[in-house]
Regions:
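A short acidic/glycine-rich loop-to-helix N-cap element
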Residues: 129-135, 163-166
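Positively charged n-region of N-terminal signal peptides that target proteins for export
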Residues: 1-6
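A solvent-exposed, acidic/Ser-Thr-rich amphipathic alpha-helical stretch
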Residues: 35-38, 56-111, 121, 135
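Bacterial N-terminal signal peptides
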Residues: 8-21
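Short beta-strand edge/turn micro-motifs at domain boundaries
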Residues: 23, 117, 137-164
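Short, low-complexity N-terminal intrinsically disordered segments enriched in polar/charged residues
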Residues: 20-62, 165-166
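A short hydrophobic beta-strand element
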Residues: 114-124
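A short, structured loop/turn motif at beta-sheet edges
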Residues: 109-116, 129-132, 144-150
């Protein structure tokens, strides 16, 4: 009557028991990834706030001070490589504008180990020193590295979105 042998039942029991820790580990991994994504989003918000405040001190805290850090802003004419150059680029940009308004209209974050990337769309409004306003949307990619529980930026690229004229 019994369709399963005692040996088959024992093997099936072992397989099911083995899946419980694996399932638990996957659940913990997903929870960690969710936590990392939330922390990357928070780091992105700190970055945006530093830009809006034109605060180089705040910018200094969100970036990794590495020779491989990179910056390409929406008004850039060159790629800036290395933290010292990145910091100077931000100082220059902060000096060009009396006000910066920036918000994330869309954001997608992914983590993989100690590296994360956030891509999305920024809405930007700049008040120049001459009183003229420059408004645009930009595709943005930010890359972060996890260091001691903190996610620090190692690359920022923002590219203006060109819209076809009607």
């Amino acid at each position: 009557m019994n369709r399963f042998s005692t040996g088959a039942i024992a093997v099936l029991s072992l397989l099911l028991a083995a899946e419980l820790p694996v399932g638990r580990a996957l659940s913990q991994e997903r929870a960690q990834e969710r936590s990392d994504i939330d922390r990357v989003k928070a780091a992105s918000q700190v970055f945006i706030a530093a830009i809006a405040a034109r605060d180089i001190g705040a910018m200094d805290k969100v970036w990794a001070h590495e020779s491989y850090a990179t910056f390409i802003g929406p008004l850039s004419t060159t790629i800036v490589i290395g933290w010292d150059g990145v910091k100077k680029a931000w100082e220059m940009r902060f000096g060009q504008f009396d006000r910066v308004t920036i918000s994330l209209a869309e954001s997608h974050v992914r983590t993989n180990g100690r590296v994360a990337w956030a891509v999305g769309v920024e809405r930007v409004e700049l008040l120049r020193k001459d009183g003229k306003t420059l408004s645009f949307d930009a595709f943005v990619t930010n890359v972060f590295e996890e260091r001691g529980g903190r996610w620090l930026m190692v690359s920022h690229q923002a590219t203006p979105i060109f819209r076809a004229a009607d």
